[in-house]
Amino acid sequence: MLKGMSFRWSLVIPVKTLVAAKTRLADATGPHRTRFAVAVASDTVAAALSCPAVARVIVVTADPAAAVPLAALGAEVVTDPDRGLNTALRTGAAHAVSVAPGEAVGALQADLPALRPAELATALGAAAEFDQAFVPDALDVGTTFYGVRPGVPFTPRFGGESRARHLAGGAKELCVPGIDSVRRDVDTPADLEAAIALGLGRHTAAVVAELWPRSGASG
């Protein structure tokens, strides 16, 4: 670890096939589940691209319904080999290193509809102090971000209780104040309510306002 150094980042964002996305929100979103998932991913990607610490965003997906709108926002799209989440992330990371070997590489979950560029910049600045680091989710069970400095092996351990696995793998847990939007992933209706309280990005806010007019969502 070299104190005080910072890097620009290549961020890899995995977007699963949308017919399988957000199953725990299926009852709430009904036939609009795909549209909702695209909106959430769009807000995540847009916020990441607006972060000054981010040089590029690489979306890994096999679904054209996600690839087309996310590429239109400015993301680079890499085809998901469909061998699991961590394989998808490693595929995106390999692409990042091939095009920008001097950049740090991070994995960011796609379901952060309240993500704020300034809060992401704070998290990335903290991560740059360590060879590998991660941000736990709001429940302190999963992980929303994992990143490594340039030249450090990229070994993501996402899925389920990934916080414990990232700790066991030697990654530094980033207990940084003021990054609530980086930690607030959305898998359930309760998660969505918490994200609404933080303030949704414009894509998700538009869908939520249409589906639930009294939600108080605003972009």
Report residues per predicted region:
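N-terminal nucleotide-binding beta1-loop-alpha1 segment
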Residues: 1-25
